[in-house]
Amino acid sequence: MTVRNTCCALLLGCALIPLIIACDKWENETVESTYQGIITPDPTYNFKRAGNSSVDILECKLLKEAVDLTYRHLHEANFTNEELYKLARGYYENGEFGLKPQEEIATSSQHEANRAQLLAEVEDIFTKSCELSGYGKPNASMIRNTPAEEGKGGYLGVNIGDANLCFADAKGVVVAELFQGIADGSIYLDKVLNIHLDDALFQNEALRMAHQNAEVLPGRNYTELEHHWDLAYGYYQYWLPYTQGNGLAILRDSKINLYNAFARGRGALTRYRYDSVELQIKNIRKELSKVVAVRAMRAFVGENTEANLAEEIRNALFFISQGCGALYALPFTRKEDGSSFFSYAEVQTMLEELTSGRGLWDAERLQGTTDTEGALQHIASTIGQRFGIALEEVKRNR
């Protein structure tokens, strides 16, 4: 064999490896796609004043750390004693370095009317996690070691020692995923689109004048308007993974479009071109709202969910629960004119459809058509219609 033929054979062999890996699965094993799109380096978001950085997004990282710690404890449902329960509550209520997740839920003026209900839902998530943990019961460990089944909460996995263990309630909902969805929508997305990029800020004459006079905040190197823009970019980072698209044409340019909008908007702010700033805000609303919609739709009808649903309903519950959590972000999206794509009441209706009757254990209903109330295609189609996205656009060609 020639050197050229040898190289071709090696390349062909390497090309087949991902196909073999992606097709390997065993009975009763959760199937998760191994496909990855082309990974490109992230561009640098860097602005300076007098030679020093004028960007400070530390707040975003510190708040996310407290959210992540809260989620981890809920995900493990390990409240087998009061000390562990108080630890998780502490991360949620007191946070880290003064940034408290509980105080940051739905704080924008557009969504403060729903704040009390969202806080109540988080309390319900803690309550269900306590029940799954056996908190306050003498046989707590035995309760936590109970596998989930229809009508009975417990763990999802082959056994309690599984690395990817999660816990579902009696309806089959992995409640920790609801918390993550609430955080993604009512904290991160709300801060990006409804707080730090709100039209009222950048149309405020006093803030514009202070910005043009380079009146930096006390002890800082940025103006108030600059900081609002940068915080929006900082909180957007926690939605950045969903822009990748895994080969979906509908998200092919989302990552670079959003980066360009943030960078151009910041640059326009530096040059006091407020008309351009407002244009980039509209671009961010449009592109990021599309990302939010696609993320929710894929959780319901993407390849991971469909493959596992066809194999074994237990294996699909985690992915469907991620979809249930993703619904909470929909009211925090914004059209170019500033209005929301979905109301909180509409999201509640979709959640009620999914969890009615046998809940997520009802595989036959879940696998229904777009005309079947409570079917995954029906929910995904409802979302897509509002955003102008077809179901076929969120399914990767296999």
Name each model feature, range by range:
Residues 1-10:
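Bacterial N-terminal signal peptides that target proteins for export
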Residues 14-15:
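Hydrophobic alpha-helical transmembrane segments of integral membrane proteins
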Residues 18-22:
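C-terminal motif of bacterial Sec signal peptides marking the signal peptidase cleavage site
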Residues 28-398:
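Mature extracytoplasmic or organellar-lumen-exposed domains after removal of signal/transit peptides
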